[in-house]
Design a protein with these regions (language model features):
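Intrinsically disordered, low-complexity linker/tail regions enriched in polar/charged residues
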Residues: 24, 32, 174, 209-211, ...
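Bacterial Sec-dependent N-terminal signal peptides
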Residues: 1-25
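Outer-membrane beta-barrel "beta-signal"
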Residues: 273, 290-303
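Long, repeat-rich segments with strong aromatic
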Residues: 227-228, 232-242, 246-274, 279-282, ...
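Short proline/glycine-enriched turn/loop segments at secondary-structure junctions
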Residues: 4, 283-287
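Outer-membrane pore/translocation modules
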Residues: 73-86, 93, 108-232, 243-245, ...
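Outer-membrane beta-barrel initiation region
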Residues: 23-132, 143-146
């Protein structure tokens, strides 16, 4: 019976994947398969496609199997208010499914003396306890991340890399839960993008905005105050490393590092490997140290 339930869960995942993949391929057609920063962010006159066209933002993937060495069964917050005292722990499986959706659209172009573009973006990451029949297969955590992004093209060289863009974003991220499991934060994120041959680099320092009711006052000490994304693409393979750090270089240095590999299998089917270690894989896990490994399929990559 248990084996049948597992097979049914896997069937649901792959049925969902092929359904979503067909919709995404129709939405992001060949005209939106963007292979560099200039095309993805419309940084010159030859790449401009106008406003309100939905295009990829961050990677989209489905991981039927995502393993954690330290499932967060009783989340706790740095907020000492009694409302944030969690009840006894939940028996979560250390294997679950994970998937990410992410897209953006340009709403204004040619702002700031004709050079800047204003974008709206949305990313959603879901963690699904699909193999946990005892808990009726709940979604353990869903993070919602809308952004308003101002992007400005630039053209100069630094350390052999070509700077392609700079900008700033207003970012909100929350998990939509009530106390004691509510987690959220608002950030002003500065960014810069660089390219050199097969390499692409994003640098993103950020400032956290204060909140009257703070679900997680110490989140920056765990998740970090900025991140670095290094991407290498060759022969259909795309490798990405993302590292975040709290910029505290004492014994309380914390952050997260993740490595992903998207590799071609056949036609549009691409495998996806995602490995991470540190804090903040999700908002509810912002202060939970864990190592995770996920295997699945890629829908959209960084490039």
């Amino acid at each position: 019976m248990k084996l049948l339930q597992i097979k049914f869960s896997i069937f649901i995942l792959f049925f969902s994947y092929f359904t979503v993949n067909a919709q995404i391929q129709a939405l992001f057609n060949n005209k939106t398969q963007l292979r560099n920063l200039t095309e993805r962010w419309e940084l010159d006159t030859t790449s401009v496609r106008g406003t309100f066209l939905v295009t990829p933002y961050k990677p989209m993937y489905v991981l039927p199997v995502r393993w954690s060495n330290n499932p967060n069964e009783q989340p706790h917050s740095g907020n000492i208010d009694p409302d944030y005292i969690a009840p006894p722990g939940v028996d979560y499986n250390n294997i679950e499914a994970k998937f990410q959706l992410s897209f953006k659209t340009k709403v204004l172009q040619g702002v700031f003396w004709g050079r800047g573009d204003l974008w709206v973006a949305y990313t959603q990451i879901s963690h699904w306890q699909i193999y946990n029949n005892n808990l009726s297969r709940p979604f353990r955590e869903v993070n919602y991340e809308p952004e308003l992004i101002l992007n400005i093209p630039v053209n100069f060289k630094i350390f052999g890399f070509k700077a392609r863009m700079v900008g700033v974003a207003f970012n909100h991220e929350s998990n939509g839960k009530s106390d004691p499991f509510s987690r959220s934060w608002n950030r002003v994120i500065f960014h810069a993008g660089f390219e050199r041959n097969n390499w692409t680099v994003y640098i993103r320092p950020w400032l956290r905005m204060p909140a009257a009711k703070d679900d997680n006052p110490d989140i920056s000490e765990y998740v970090g105050r900025g991140d670095l994304n290094i991407i290498y693409a060759k022969n259909g393979n795309i490798f990405s490393f993302i590292g975040s750090h709290n910029l505290n270089f004492s014994s309380k240095a914390r952050g997260n590092s993740s490595f992903s590999w998207s590799y071609p299998i056949k036609n549009n089917l691409k495998g996806y490997l995602l490995v991470s270690h540190g804090y903040g894989e999700t908002l509810i896990d912002y202060n939970n140290l864990q190592t995770t490994v996920g295997v699945g399929v890629s829908l959209i990559e960084w490039l």
